[in-house]
């Protein structure tokens, strides 16, 4: 076993100002050890979302001295068959149990597969034209679907097994012919990235009846051989994963193989310790993944849900630490849902449908409330009756954690009664579907989010490959409750970032005040000189408010406001404080399937002195 598989990485104001917008009356090295695992709440029990992580949450399961020796020997490269049964021949390849699929796929995508196409984010790609060897690179979303075999869940969802098994076997045979042997290490094409290989091993095991129930004995033997070879490849290469989430996927594949393939106990012990360590590095103190991406949060939950199904198939309880971590992952994700249960558009995600999210949360077995203040993950959530405000109050993720990192600091989304009024464009992660790949970097830019932009520059540099460069490094945050009479109280959030200081000498500060009845959102965007000697001259600014789908907008006669008509028949008014010009521009929004939808945006724009400026605005429900 390679050194990489044995290596470990290190873990990853006193007196607030008065409101600027006052409201009127209107064991071994490399494995986490040293603490007993904490008890996880039983499935279905309401979890308190504010509970902080304890060291015990990331402790490997308690094992005896003999099992510790087995785990150490396996890490050193002694075959599992030798450790599990040293006095007999290695067992023949077979599966020890059948796994029940805990997460149904897309019937529409499965139907497309039966018709001969992969359907990914609205684009049909003929199976016959897919290069399974990976010499000709595909769009990233299609590449992930093809090589992770996540499409098996879609196929299983669309028809009885006997009706779709032949399709699965045909694609499986083509993939195995193009990938007969694993390479020595990752990097030999997308099929052998650790994230794809780990997810593929897990999906093969969860959906094994689709690819092993046919009459073709030669294919069956090839599939069983591929299961074993992929597991051994992951044993050696999981430490070379492209990022932490990919490493977690690799460890999940290892543990699943240890549970369901013969002589797997040494691999399972090795994999459980590695998985819990990797999760400890992936997840922050409040349960949010360090990429700050809700899609990353969803992927981590889905991996653990499928892995738990493998434990259930062999009638073995998963480690308590895995259940505890599952309970920590769900509340931050729910903080980014709107009133209709669908997802906000953050860090490259699209507005995932409520039904899909609800199915994931139900499968997790975690009953909990959304976190209100996910401060370390970087998001604030305010619920005011039917109004929901989501606010990005943190720097973008570090480059090593980002997959589709976005320069979205101080952006917000706002919905009322399930109707989205203000959104972010989203969709960078699904670029390559109906959203052209050339728009990927633009959808990650500051201008694609509902916040202030200076001189058309990003508050944090947006780099290729989903990475993030220099820019915002500090965000100050203050949140408080304002007491008022007759439901006139409010929640006030004030935050500032330094992303424009080095270029323009200005700090962006944003104040948002949402009334407790959810019908009025006041805002103020301030540009404050960062030093005693401010720079001279003026710089262009634009404060963008991307409007939700179905919102009809028209400017007022004085040019200082706009009327917003929503699909539910309600009417809202937007007003500005006199500084800047208000305009309507075209925009784009990624819907629940990752498809582009045309929307509009309100833009306050003009020139501001390097000495600073203040721009107030109001969004109010009129009827």
What are these regions (language model features)?
Residues 2-127:
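Extreme N-terminal leader/anchor segments
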Residues 2-10, 21-24, 140, 198, ...:
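CBM-like, beta-strand-rich accessory domains located in the C-terminal region of large
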Residues 110-111, 373-375, 405-407, 445, ...:
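Short solvent-exposed loop/turn micro-motifs enriched in small/polar/acidic residues
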Residues 115, 377-381, 411, 449, ...:
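Short, acidic/polar N-cap/turn motifs at the starts of alpha helices
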Residues 118-143, 156-160:
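Asp/Glu-centered strand-loop micro-motifs enriched in Gly/Pro and often flanked by an aromatic residue
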Residues 140-326, 574:
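Aromatic-lined, polymer-binding surfaces characteristic
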Residues 249, 407-409, 447:
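Short, solvent-exposed loop/turn segments at the edges of secondary structure
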Residues 284-427, 609:
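Carbohydrate-active enzyme catalytic cores, enriched for enzymes
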């Amino acid at each position: 076993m390679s050194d990489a598989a044995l290596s470990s990485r290190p873990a990853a104001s006193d007196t607030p100002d008065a409101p600027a917008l006052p409201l009127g009356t209107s064991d071994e090295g490399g494995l986490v050890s040293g603490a007993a695992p904490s008890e996880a709440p039983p499935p279905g029990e309401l979890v308190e979302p504010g509970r902080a992580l304890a060291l015990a949450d990331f402790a490997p399961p308690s094992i005896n001295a003999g099992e510790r020796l087995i785990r150490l020997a396996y890490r050193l490269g002694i075959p599992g068959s030798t450790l599990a049964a040293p006095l007999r021949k290695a067992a023949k390849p077979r599966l020890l149990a059948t796994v029940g699929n805990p997460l149904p796929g897309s019937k529409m995508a499965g139907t497309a597969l039966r018709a001969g196409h992969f359907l990914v984010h609205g684009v049909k790609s003929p199976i016959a034209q897919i290069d399974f060897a990976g010499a000709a690179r595909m769009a990233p979303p299609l590449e992930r679907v093809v090589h992770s075999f996540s499409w098996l869940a879609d196929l299983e969802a669309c028809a009885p097994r006997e009706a779709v098994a032949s399709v699965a076997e045909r694609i499986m045979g083509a993939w195995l012919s193009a990938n007969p042997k694993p390479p020595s290490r990752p990097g030999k094409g997308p099929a052998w990235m650790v994230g794809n290989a780990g997810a593929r091993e897990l999906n093969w095991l969860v959906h094994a009846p689709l690819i092993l129930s046919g009459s073709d004995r030669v294919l069956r033997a090839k599939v069983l051989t591929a299961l074993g070879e992929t597991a051994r490849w992951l044993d050696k290469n999981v430490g070379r994963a492209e990022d932490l989430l990919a490493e977690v996927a690799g460890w999940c594949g290892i543990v699943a193989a240890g549970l369901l393939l013969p002589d797997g106990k040494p691999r399972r012990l090795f994999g459980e310790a590695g998985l819990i360590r990797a999760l400890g590095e992936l997840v922050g103190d409040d349960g949010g993944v360090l990429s700050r991406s809700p899609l990353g949060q969803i992927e981590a939950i889905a991996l653990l849900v499928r892995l738990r199904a493998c434990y259930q198939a062999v009638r073995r309880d998963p480690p308590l630490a895995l259940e505890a971590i599952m309970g920590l992952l769900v509340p931050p994700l729910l903080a980014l849902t709107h009133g209709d249960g669908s997802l906000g558009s953050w860090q490259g995600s699209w507005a995932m449908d409520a039904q899909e999210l609800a199915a994931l949360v139900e499968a997790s077995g975690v009953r909990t409330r959304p976190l209100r203040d996910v401060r370390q993950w970087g998001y604030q959530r305010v619920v005011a009756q039917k109004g929901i405000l989501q606010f990005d109050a943190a720097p973008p993720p570090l480059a090593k954690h980002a997959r589709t990192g976005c320069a979205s600091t101080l952006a917000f989304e706002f919905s009322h009664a399930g109707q989205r009024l203000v959104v972010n464009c989203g969709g960078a992660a699904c670029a390559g579907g109906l959203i052209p790949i050339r728009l990927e970097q633009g959808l990650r830019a500051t201008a694609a989010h509902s916040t202030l932009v200076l001189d058309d520059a990003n508050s944090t540099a947006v780099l290729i490959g989903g990475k993030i460069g220099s820019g915002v490094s500090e965000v100050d945050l203050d949140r408080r409750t304002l007491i008022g009479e007759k439901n006139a109280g409010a929640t006030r959030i004030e935050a500032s970032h330094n992303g424009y200081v080095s270029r323009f000498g200005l700090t962006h500060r944003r104040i948002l005040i949402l009334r407790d009845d959810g019908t009025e959102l006041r805002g103020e965007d301030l540009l404050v000189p960062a030093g005693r000697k401010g720079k001279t001259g003026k710089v262009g600014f634009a404060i963008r408010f991307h409007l939700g789908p179905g919102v009809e907008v028209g400017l007022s006669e004085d040019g200082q406001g706009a009327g917003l008509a929503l699909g539910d028949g309600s009417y809202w008014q937007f007003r500005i404080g006199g500084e800047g010009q208000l305009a309507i521009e075209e925009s784009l929004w990624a819907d629940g399937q990752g498809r582009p939808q045309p929307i509009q945006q309100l833009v306050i724009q003009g020139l501001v002195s390097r000495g600073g400026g203040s721009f107030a605005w109001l969004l109010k429900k009129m009827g």
